[in-house]
Amino acid sequence: MLSLLVSNSLERIYSADPEVRPSDALMSLDYLVRTGLNQDAEDSESDDGCDAAIVRINRDAHSMEFAGVKIGLFHLSADGTVRRHVGSRASLGYRQPPDEEDLPVAQTIAYSPGDVFVIVTDGFTDQPGGDKSMPVAFGYRRIEQLLSELRGQSADQISHRLREAFNHWQGPRQRRDDVTAVVFNL
């Protein structure tokens, strides 16, 4: 139900204003999820929400605007440099609206043709695994290291290698959360 509410809310937001900034779209999404689940009512027993990221690309200017809530964006340059753009600490839609300092902030990111971008959910980074008897989370550093090793590869190849690395890391352990990875190049 939450996925459908988010999808319909985003459609509503962008139908009203196709040029809405990613940070403003996330704030509207926060409100629409909270009210759509009636979590704005004092007697509400529900307290559900989501994490999200939105990217708006300006191909003419070779830039993108990114805003995320509990989701970041990795930028792999052609020279192999990996930059991590961190999203805000807030989540969307919960009964308690985000504090002012946790509101999503749009980041403008310049890119060169061929650069690759990766967005992963916390299900990817938080998955315990590894070869040790005491499993540890996949983490952000492991993604950064893998991306730097994959310099020059296509988005499809990087997506495939991320999936392989994640599955190997997870091993026989149970998956703890939904896992999403979006990989694209510009």
Predicted regions and their residues:
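Conserved subregion of the PPM/PP2C metallophosphatase catalytic domain
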Residues: 7-186
